[in-house]
Amino acid sequence: MAKILVIDDDPDFVNATRMVLEKEGHTIIRAANGNQGFQMAKQEMPDLVILDVMMDSVLDGLSTSRKMSEDASTANTPIIMATSIASTSFAEYFPTDEYLHVRAFLSKPVRPADLVRQVKRFLPKEK
């Protein structure tokens, strides 16, 4: 079905995401930080990216989403941002959607049904 790039430094999250989405027939590729993820997105041309906010630096995911939106080869790739930041006091300082280049947010821990629903929502329709 689809090739999905998961950019996250938490191997448990990546493995859980892989298990859920491979059951749906998707191929999962992984990057452990924003720079690696950006390079993989340019090389692999995934159908969708699931991106963590905080990895190497506090806002690594935000800078990665910005770089992807500014690069012609990745600008149209839908991004779902997965974060545990929504349940912290840091959330009030988080940029609003108008400053982000993402299609949706998922709060960690992510429920499998929510993950599947959001992925289906943003994948290109099958021909």
Task: Name each region found by the language model.
Residues 44-51, 55:
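Active-site beta3 strand of CheY-like receiver
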Residues 45-47, 73-79:
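His-Asp phosphorelay/catalytic-motif detector in bacterial-type signaling
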Residues 7-8, 31, 49:
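Conserved sequence signature across two-component system core domains
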Residues 39, 62-75:
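Short amphipathic alpha-helix used as the core "switch/output" element in two-component signaling
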Residues 15-23:
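Charged docking surfaces used in two-component/phosphorelay signaling
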Residues 25-32, 40:
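Short hydrophobic/Thr-rich beta-strand motif most characteristic of the beta2 strand and flanking loop
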Residues 59-63, 85-107, 113, 117:
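Alpha4 helix (beta4-alpha4-beta5 surface) of REC/receiver domains from two-component response regulators
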